[in-house]
Structures are given as structure tokens and as C-alpha cells.
Amino acid sequence: MISQFEIIGDNKIGVLPKQVDQLQMCRDIAASKDLQENDSSFMLVDLDKIIERFQLWKRELPMIEPFYAVKCNTDLVLIRILASLGCGFDCASKDEIDIVMGTGVSAERIIYANPCKTRSFIAHAMDRDVKMMTFDNPEELLKIAKLHPNAEMILRIAVSDPTATCPLNLKFGADPIIAAPQLLKTASEEGINVVGISFHVGSGCNDASAYRNALQHAKNLCEIGEGLGFKMDIIDMGGGFPGAEHHNPFEKIAETIRDALDEFFPDTNKRLIAEPGRFFAAGPFSLVANIIHATEVPASKITKDPKDCADHGYMYYINDGVYGSFNCILFDHAHPIGSPLFDTDRNEKFMSTIWGPTCDSLDLVEDKKLMPKMNVGEWLYYPDMGAYTLAAATTFNGFSKPVPMYVMSEEMWESIRDSTHV
């Protein structure tokens, strides 16, 4: 169990003598809450895993600087840990810039990676000396030139993987063949400083070859930009890196990127950056929700098949839902899979539905799920719940967000404790 408590920012951190076992730690916390008759949901945050993910990144892609996509999860402890490791930050708004700089991160470690920015936010970026920022259209280019003449502009191109969980090229990115060269010419004519090329293959990329195609376009555009007198020092590879077990593992994506860099940018002195979000945020966060109600129904009510009317089914209601942490189901196309937190000897499984706590029938967490019969007061465990969950959670209907509980091992604590960001 926890051997000591430390502080990161304003948050209490439980330090353990050995590596964190997320499932067992969740069981220990839930058992303690049961003794206190406390059924509130909670989010265990394993800070070791953030450091391990950073180490994995540096091992597989040592030539690329990670700039964490703050929109994915604005948890301040997560941000402080990444800052202490030397990570940069991808911000999309005034508030995100202030959140990051509030932890002591310098402006040089921030990219304002939103191609369509509010005018007052651009002025704020200038006030805070944040210079790197993206654009994908002439109107944005001229708007930034007027409001932030010292900005270092990075041209975002549309190269999204069409099979990605969340393709992004419908909203952002200039056509790399037609529009992008013209934007470089416009910037040159207006005397605006363009320093590189940016792309984003889509959140939850399924096709690693999308990175190769994007880097090929980036090489061509760098040559055009250099011909116009720009230095073109930066290649920003965006996000799309998986944060949990995935049919297209990170190591395979990293291999594709390394090969493409060798092909298109051999012996380069360019600054290579990327904007991973879920890669860092997903795995450290485990959600534990309490079953607040259970009711038996004909299985046909769940399967919508009249032939199942004689079978038993169960509908469970838990104290978190799509208006809370599970908003990822609606906004991130996620499919969280929960399981009983504690082992059970109830081997028979029944067709089940997991509902959130609100009065809205849209608040559906899992459907047509086979699981043992559960009772009110028991707990369900959902791993890998840190990406695009808490960042968009609400308190609709008066239901609270889960409380984060932070833990890490003594070894990892010693590795970061002296950082100015902690």
C-alpha cells in the first residue's frame, strides 16, 4: 500500500514502495470506500505509466520531440509530469496556453496548433511570446501577420488517414498539391515568416502508411518553401498515435515513420516534432464506477429479438455516463469495455446493458454485453480512460465527475521530484 504522500502542484500523490498495479490499487481503494459506505466513482491515475510512455516514445522515436496535445486531457498533474520530462505542448486556445505556462513551461515549448484562431487569442499568444503557430488558409495567414508579426508560421496540410477513428481533413488542412504551394507564395509576397510544415493523419490512425504519404508531401513543400527563401526548419507530424492496445501498435507506426524519415529527410537538421495526446493520456487513467441500481428484464428487451423473451437479462445503472467520463463514446467514437472490479464465482453470464445515471436515454455506456449477475453497490472497472474523457465531462443532472486519485512508485517519484514543474 501507500508508503508516503507527496505533493505535485496542489494535488496529493500516494507513493508506493514498488511499481503500481492499477487493478489491485483500484480494488484496495474500492474496498476502503465500501467500509466507509462511500459509493462515489473515482479515477485512479498511475503516474508511473506517464513516465513509461515517455520513455517508450524516446526509445522508438528519439529524433522527434513530443508536444503533448493538451485538449486530450488537461489534468494538471499529467501536464506537470510531462513538463518535468521535457515534453513540449500543443495548445489550441488562450486557456490551454495559460494552463501550460502556469506550470512553468516556457513559450518556446508551446505550439499554438489551431489553424483558425480567435483574434484576441492571437494577441494573447503574442503577449505571452508564443510564436509557433499553424495556418491552412490565406485569411488566417494575413490575420496572424497583422496581430502577431513575429509569429513563426507552420503550414498545415490535409493528409488524413480516411480510416482513422476521427479523420480531421474535412475541417483542417490545405490541399498539399494545389492550395499549399499557393499559400507559401502568398506568405512570401506578404513578407510573412513560414518555418515549416504540419500535418495530422487523424485521431486514432489505423493506417501507418498515412505518415509516409504525409512526409512525402512535407518534403515537396519544404523544397518549394526553401525556393521562396523560407528556412523551413520544422516538420510537425501531428497526432494519431494509439494510447492503449491497438491493432496497429505504436512500435509499427514508429517503424514506418523512421523509414519515411530516412527516405525523405536523410541526414536532416530539421526540427522534428509531433503532437501525441492519447498516447500519453489514455493508459494512466482507470475509471471505477459503482452500480447504483440493477433490474431484471427479459433478455429480448436488450437484444431486440423476441426469441429471447424467456431468457433473463439485466440492466445496470452506474454513477458515471456519457455526460461524464464516457462522453468519449459520443465525441471520440470510443468503445469502453468494463468488467467486474472484483473476481466473482458467478460463472453464468447474462445479456446486460450498462446505463449512465442521468435521466437521458442517450446515456448508454455498454449494450448487449454478456456478464455475470451483479448487485447494487458492486464496482465496474474501465481501464485506459484518460483520453478525451475528463476533458469534456460535465455535471449534467447534478452528477459529479469522478475524483482523480494519483499514485506512483518511489523509484519514479525520485526521478522527477527535483523538477521545477513538480
Swiss-Prot record:
Pfam families: Orn_Arg_deC_N, Orn_DAP_Arg_deC. The active site is at residue 359. GO terms for cellular component: cytoplasm. The keyword Cell wall biogenesis/degradation does not apply. Keywords: Decarboxylase, Lyase, Polyamine biosynthesis, Pyridoxal phosphate. GO terms for molecular function: ornithine decarboxylase activity. This is Ornithine decarboxylase. It comes from Caenorhabditis elegans.
